[in-house]
């Protein structure tokens, strides 16, 4: 059971400056030799080549490790071939592990399914053949818009088997966002569901998708999974039920060898403009990164551990540490369809106890929610199976870290606070649980083979203190480009400090021990519950409302969700500034992007701070929203707008805010 917890105990833990690895953990850890850091930094290419050969099975062994002749368009293991589906399925079955459970699936209403590696291999081969029969070929993009059900894994690996890059779309996105992602990727097929379940309610999915993709010329096939029992229309010739497609397909589909640089998937991430970024990850480098970090950071023993990453597969964390990382290592994982507070607030801990979860990976937002709900919920359950905890998605504050350590980990489990991005593909900065003395709130050190640094604005490295986080050497799992937009790729990531330095977009601090403390975004991306949302995309949604003349959004600190969205909105002349209008705008944003993007606060504004060139100064908006002096306003077109906004914000402070969305990324 969890260790007794009290405010007094928390105060005691806050005085502890570091938490060394437990002796027993260190003795059996995969990464237990401190020399691994020096070995990797002495020759990073040799290190990564060793990981690629050790962790993966290659059809054609590579002879060239890194081609860096055209930075920032790096190529890893380019003359090798392999298949991601084979590395996640076939080789484990061939090694005699076909009966090992790949996923304990737990449905929202308590349904349970165990899927073995052999089960998944059989279904993946049939779906792959079914897609080929519908005309899907190597290089064709396949959209996937599914809830957290086993078919989402089958769909991803079936695409990988035939070389069709998949583009998974988070199930919480609105149909219009789905259309945009399918359109810009020229997706040839979409795999979706009849409906989705959330907290006891069922929402139609297929019917909404139909409306969104009505005139999308490139989309030739929609495969529909019966998931929620929702009625939905089926268009003859285009639409096919999942079970019918599999039922008519041959059961043998050999995995096709893919060039290491062949795109494995696209994943659309929020940027500082309204257009989402289609991040491209390739087969050999991405698999090397996630297979290696899964093994070293989470230290799984496939024979006895049960791993649970609570992320949705629609986000990079789900790609890397629900699907590809665990499966490349032959692990047993948990997949959960529902929310952390349904049917009650102890459902996660019931699942941990039920399946004897030993490694648990979730987001600080979820931890803060559990803190708010109280220790009585985890105290109902036996959590003694846990031996390692992890966090992902945003920085975790020391208080939440220590609560996680004490209440969930029983003060015996190391915590790996992981920093990485959709763009990096795999974890970049994290403790190694058998080696690293952890500090609450710090991501600690770059992993072996990763070169991270802090720069000042002039590009000079900072040994200690605050700066801009950068990665100074290429790594295998890095994004290769933005889909059909190489110029934006260079401009976004490799223009500030040159083509050989990856600009992260996060600020950080490095302490006297060389530990990194991530301080947050320095661009216009808003991080709500670990979900990255584009300020420009939210503004575009608000302005699309017929009664809105202008909108500007910013992020403010939020105790529960890390950050929340505050929108300053100018209504068209004659529109009454009423509370009912605020709720209408929240619903409007939810309909165009998704509930996660709903502004927690909407403040009526006559104007917003802009430079003389018309650029919105969101930094000043954030200062005002958080009650700080906005400081120098000499670059503004009209500095008097600041006082007006401060007054409007102070007045709004007296009114209740909208409820935040605390969905799971995790």
Question: Where do the model's predicted regions map?
Answer:
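Conserved pre-ATP/AMP-binding loop-to-beta segment of ANL
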Residues: 99-101, 223-224, 235-268, 275, ...
